[in-house]
């Protein structure tokens, strides 16, 4: 331990033991405990207690809980556990009966402060820290602590109850350690005392009539099989699987969700022989006994298993498909997917749930659609995948939601009334519909998909969220439609669809709802990014009013919409699709957009549009946009001037990224779009051209990055440091580095560095020649600064000495004015 910390420790222990002192808040105590953990990892806990008697005095004082505050009680219980984690220190503490006085049945559980959850939680955590060696196991078995943990499983505090269950699993695993590798696992009756006690308690709880007790037992088993992958878990399952199986004989089945979690946890175990232990039969029985809404998560979990019999996979997949099969049967004359609706009890139960109430119907359909959507993206996705039937079901659900379905039965009519206008189901169906775009579908169904999407996008009844989902699904079907994988062009059917879509998109761009305008702009941006270079798409877009409306939204009153409009305008301009009159004014219109974006960057009151402008400008610079190439120096200078005054740190970071792109093009590998590298050889020269260094001195780039080194926002300073390191590596010769004072303009260099060191980084550097700029780059310890910036912002104040000093400094502060120094 640090000598200064040793000097401060007695005073701090005295303060903690004094209930009249309102010491620190919980955060400081947590940091103090973390520090003690670090110390005990490097030193002997026993030696630490012997060298610092004040610690033993504090811990002994806790045996009089009426004289200690609850938060200090909780801290002390955990601290004792940290010390007792080392076996020699455990025995030392046990001799003085400190451990029994704190963790025994007559200890903390008998205190008045035991009613406070944080004290109970501290007691559990203290036990968890010390339970790391055989001596601790004997103590736990003899002290009554395990019995207290059993009662805490039902604690009203969920955190305490969960911690108690986790600790029981930890104790069980610790008890079973120590067997010789390869030796046979003894029967459960021959297990250590602690292990037997826990297993017997779990067994009794599984036979209990009260559901909470059953749930507690199942949770312990689930955690055990999830964490412990040793052979003894097979003996444990052999012992407890019969009472688990008998839970299915009850009506209703208790703790269904906990029971499903257990079965899946056991099924993932790498050490069990599933065929021998009857797990597959138990899973099959469970799938058939549960209601459709209960069986869905278990069916999905079963299908995710690596080694699962095909028969069980088929059963689980059938459970997931059944609700959609019922939808198809209720709305069409076709029987739906073969073999899924055969008059079984399961299918009748599904129909009953779909028709029982709106909440039950909506819940089952949303769960089913989400599970199937997740399943399609997994490697364990069933094959063959019933693409056609699932697509028909998704479209049918959307028809039911918009009221256009033509039911063939009374059940279908009731479904129309239940699902009509249901936004939640519409959203789930559109998500699933988008996922189905990855499969191969017949042309007539693809055309129906486009028709349903058009209707949804056009309907005045569609909510903003439904429209957003419809735009996303539309994009996915356009990106991956029924075409050859090598083709990136839009199909003729997709182009016809776009011809009908653009008038609808025009209306949505004029929507009074800002969320709709925003979604429409995002959709347009994606469209242009993917197909802006295709002639047919360009013609269809130009023949609409969409580009004009998108540019008008640069003046939208909502900042999110302005930001999306900036992105759309940037894409339109990059592809030469911006709205403009005939050719004479085309160049002026293009320049007009550039100035509009510059105006937004300089004057917009919200950060989102300004950030969007910087992203567009960075892309334009990287891609060699015509307006940027026309006068790159003016462009970069104007942008950086505006960015240097911006109060938004994300704008400043993006400005530094733009500067990095500029330097990379000019100093890095030559680029086709870089005006400074035209005609240069492919290999980079060891020193940049003097004219470019003069350009750098004229630009505010170096000054902007130099001042940003001490930006109050760390990401900005880090980005600036990286930029200057890149600039130095590309410009300063590797050999014969010169000091700042060797520069021809050493006075100005020293003055600039002095101002920077004194914190006047906002002051302009003044006129610098290239040699002065290079001298500053040589003089700065950029690597050291980069290392300091990589540390957390409180790395100086996080020292243990600072922590102890601050905790002592807070003594006497009123509780309502407590301050966390960290």
Swiss-Prot record:
Gene3D superfamilies found in the cross-reference section: Leucine-rich Repeat Variant
Tissue expression notes: High levels detected in the cortex and much lower levels detected in the cerebellum, spinal cord and lung (at protein level).
Coiled-coil intervals, chain numbering: none
Places the protein is found: Nucleus; Cytoplasm
Superkingdom classification of source: Eukaryota
Entry keywords, A to Z: Cytoplasm, DNA damage, Metal-binding, Nucleus, Phosphoprotein, Repeat, Ubl conjugation, Zinc
Quaternary structure note: Part of the multiprotein complex composed of BRAT1, WDR73, as well as integrator complex subunits INTS9 and INTS11. Interacts with BRCA1 and ATM. Interacts with MTOR and RPTOR. Interacts with NDFIP1. Interacts with SMC1A and PRKDC.
Name used for this protein in its record: Integrator complex assembly factor BRAT1
Species of provenance: Mus musculus (Mouse)
Gene: Brat1
């Amino acid at each position: 331990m640090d000598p200064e910390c040793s000097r401060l420790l007695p005073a701090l222990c005295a303060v903690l033991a004094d209930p009249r002192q309102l010491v620190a808040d919980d955060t400081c105590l947590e940091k103090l405990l973390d520090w003690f953990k670090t110390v005990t990892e490097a030193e002997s806990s026993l030696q630490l207690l012997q060298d610092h008697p004040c610690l033993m005095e504090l811990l002994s004082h806790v045996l009089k809980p009426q004289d200690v505050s609850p938060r200090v009680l909780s801290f002390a219980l955990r601290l004792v556990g940290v010390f007792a984690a080392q076996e020699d220190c455990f025995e030392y503490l046990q001799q003085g009966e400190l451990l029994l006085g704190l963790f025994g049945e007559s200890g903390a559980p008998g205190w008045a402060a035991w009613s406070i959850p944080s004290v109970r939680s501290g007691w559990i955590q203290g036990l968890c820290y010390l339970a790391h060696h055989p001596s601790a196991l004997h103590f736990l078995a003899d002290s009554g602590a395990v019995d207290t943990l059993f009662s805490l499983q039902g604690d009203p505090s969920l955190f305490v109850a969960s911690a108690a269950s986790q600790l029981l699993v930890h104790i069980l695993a610790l008890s079973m350690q120590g067997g010789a590798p390869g030796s046979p696992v003894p029967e459960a009756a021959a297990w250590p005392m602690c292990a037997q006690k826990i297993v017997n308690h779990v067994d009794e709880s599984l036979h209990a009539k009260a559901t909470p007790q059953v749930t507690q037992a199942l949770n312990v088993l689930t955690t055990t099989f999830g964490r412990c992958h040793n052979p003894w878990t097979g003996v444990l399952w052999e012992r407890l699987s019969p009472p688990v199986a008998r839970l299915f004989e009850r009506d209703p089945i208790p703790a269904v969700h906990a029971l499903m979690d257990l079965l899946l946890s056991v099924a993932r175990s790498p050490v069990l022989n599933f065929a021998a232990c009857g797990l597959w039969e138990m899973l099959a029985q469970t799938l058939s006994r549960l209601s459709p809404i209960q069986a869905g998560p278990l069916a999905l979990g079963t299908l995710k298993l690596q080694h699962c019999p095909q028969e069980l996979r088929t059963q689980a997949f059938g459970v997931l498909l059944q609700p959609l099969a019922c939808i198809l049967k209720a709305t069409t004359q076709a029987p739906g997917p073969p073999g899924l609706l055969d008059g079984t009890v399961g299918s009748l139960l599904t129909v009953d749930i779909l028709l029982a109430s709106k909440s039950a119907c909506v819940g089952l359909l949303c769960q089913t659609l989400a599970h199937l959507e997740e399943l399609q993206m997994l490697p364990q996705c069933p094959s063959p995948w019933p693409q056609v039937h699932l697509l028909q079901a998704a479209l049918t659900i959307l028809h039911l939601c918009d009221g256009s379905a033509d039911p063939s039965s009374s059940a279908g009519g009731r479904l129309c009334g239940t699902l009509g206008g249901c936004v939640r189901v519409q959203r789930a169906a559109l998500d699933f519909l988008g996922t189905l775009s990855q499969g191969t579908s017949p042309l007539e169904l693809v055309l129906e998909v486009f028709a349903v999407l058009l209707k949804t996008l056009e309907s005045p009844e569609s909510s903003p969220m439904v429209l957003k989902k419809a735009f996303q699904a539309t994009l996915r079907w356009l990106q991956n439609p029924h075409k050859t994988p090598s083709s990136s062009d839009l199909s003729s059917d997709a182009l016809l669809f776009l011809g009908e879509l653009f008038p609808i998109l025009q209306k949505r761009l004029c929507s009074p709802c800002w969320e709709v305008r925003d979604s429409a702009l995002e959709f347009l941006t994606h469209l242009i990014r993917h197909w802006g270079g295709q002639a047919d798409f360009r013609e269809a877009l130009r023949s609409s009013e969409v580009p004009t409306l998108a540019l008008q939204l640069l003046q939208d009153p909502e900042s999110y919409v302005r930001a999306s409009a900036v992105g759309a305008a940037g894409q339109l301009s990059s592809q030469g699709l911006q709205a403009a009159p005939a050719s004479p004014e085309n160049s002026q219109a293009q320049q007009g957009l550039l100035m509009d974006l510059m105006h937004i960057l300089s004057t917009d009151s919200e950060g989102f549009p300004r950030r969007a402008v910087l992203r567009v400008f960075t892309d334009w610079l990287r891609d060699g946009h015509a307006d940027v190439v026309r006068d790159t120096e003016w462009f970069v200078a104007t942008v950086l001037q505006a960015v240097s005054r911006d109060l938004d740190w994300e704008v400043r970071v993006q400005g530094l990224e733009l500067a990095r792109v500029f330097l990379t093009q000019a100093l890095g590998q030559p680029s086709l779009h870089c005006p400074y590298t035209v005609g240069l050889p492919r290999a980079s020269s060891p020193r940049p051209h003097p004219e470019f260094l003069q350009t750098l001195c004229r630009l505010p780039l170096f000054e902007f990055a130099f001042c940003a080194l001490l930006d109050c926002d760390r990401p900005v300073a880090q980005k600036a440091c990286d930029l200057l390191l890149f600039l130095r590596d590309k410009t300063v010769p590797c050999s014969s580095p010169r000091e700042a004072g060797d520069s021809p303009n050493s006075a100005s260099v020293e003055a600039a560095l002095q101002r920077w060191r004194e914190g006047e980084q906002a002051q302009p550097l003044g006129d610098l020649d290239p040699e002065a700029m290079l001298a500053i780059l040589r003089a700065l310890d950029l690597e050291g600064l980069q290392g300091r910036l990589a540390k957390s912002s409180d790395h100086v104040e996080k020292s243990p000495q600072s922590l102890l000093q601050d905790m002592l400094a807070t003594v006497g502060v009123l509780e309502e004015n407590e301050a966390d120094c960290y």
